[in-house]
UniProtKB/Swiss-Prot annotation:
Catalysed conversion reaction: octanoyl-[ACP] + L-lysyl-[protein] = N(6)-octanoyl-L-lysyl-[protein] + holo-[ACP] + H(+)
GO molecular function, one term: lipoyl(octanoyl) transferase activity
Function description: Catalyzes the transfer of endogenously produced octanoic acid from octanoyl-acyl-carrier-protein onto the lipoyl domains of lipoate-dependent enzymes. Lipoyl-ACP can also act as a substrate although octanoyl-ACP is likely to be the physiological substrate.
Other noteworthy facts: In the reaction, the free carboxyl group of octanoic acid is attached via an amide linkage to the epsilon-amino group of a specific lysine residue of lipoyl domains of lipoate-dependent enzymes.
Active-site residues annotated for this sequence: 168
Major subcellular site: cytoplasm
CDD domains: LipB (cd16444)
InterPro entries: aa-tRNA-synth_II/BPL/LPL (IPR045864), BPL_LPL_catalytic (IPR004143), Octanoyltransferase (IPR000544), Octanoyltransferase_CS (IPR020605)
Organism: Pseudomonas aeruginosa (strain ATCC 15692 / DSM 22644 / CIP 104116 / JCM 14847 / LMG 12228 / 1C / PRS 101 / PAO1)
Domain BPL/LPL catalytic, first and last residues per copy: 31-206
One cellular component term from this protein's GO annotations in UniProt: cytoplasm
Name assigned to this protein: Octanoyltransferase
Domain of life: Bacteria
A Pfam family hit: LplA-B_cat
Length: 217
């Protein structure tokens, strides 16, 4: 039997407790545990990765800034953005970090192609871009051969908070979102398409819908 990827669709959840839930999942899992992907949205928050520099947070205002343990620099999460946390046994999948990042990017490119949007990845700047504007960000952490954190895809959101930072450390980085490219977006349909892309590109045999939430403490 091939590997399954389990999906939890969690709705809108606060950032910090969700981050701690990821950490617990990775710390407590063993080789028998199914890999999971959590699909969700966050209230407005800036997260500063391990490589982040304070000067890239320009004027956060009333939006909190949280220092976290993923790779990369500062980014923004908010309602209308699809965040997907990838809790994967990378060793079991037989993937190196660069290959994992590439396959996640290809999943997003494939998803966007299903909406007739031509997107590309950049070797020097992880993420996915449409006509030079960033539509999706990536940031991962690997611990004991297992990944956490993941991707953020802009669907139908207020992009103005990105102007308060240098996204991923790039001053003036233009941002875009699916709504501005194709019109109204069905969040649930995007989730369905992304699930299929991730299962295919990451090499799973099938997907499974996991019921129940996560412990937010």
């Amino acid at each position: 039997m091939g590997l399954e990827l389990g999906f939890r669709e969690l709705g809108e959840v606060p950032y910090e407790p969700t981050w701690h839930a990821m950490q617990r999942f990775v710390a407590e899992r063993d080789k028998s545990v199914m890999d999971e992907a959590w699909l969700l949205q966050h209230p407005a928050v800036f997260t500063q990765g391990q490589a982040g520099k304070a000067e890239h947070v320009l004027f956060p205002g009333d939006i909190p800034v949280i220092q976290v343990d993923r790779g990369g620099q500062v980014t923004y999460h908010g309602p209308g953005q699809l965040v997907t946390y990838l809790l994967l046994d990378v060793r079991r999948l037989g993937l190196g970090v660069r290959e994992l990042v590439s396959r996640i990017e290809q999943s997003l490119i494939g998803l966007l192609a299903s909406y007739d949007v031509q997107a590309v990845a950049k070797p020097d700047a992880p993420g996915v871009y449409v006509d030079g504007a960033k539509i999706a960000s990536l940031g991962l952490r690997i611990r004991n051969g297992c990944s956490f954190h993941g991707l953020a895809l802009n669907l139908d959101m207020d992009l103005r908070p990105f102007q308060r930072i240098n996204p991923c450390g790039y001053a003036g980085m233009p941002m875009t979102q699916l709504r501005d490219l194709v019109g109204p977006v069905d969040f649930a349909e995007v989730c369905t398409r992304l699930r299929a892309e991730l299962v295919s590109r990451l090499g799973y045999a099938e997907q499974k819908t996991l019921t129940g939430g996560i412990e937010l403490t």
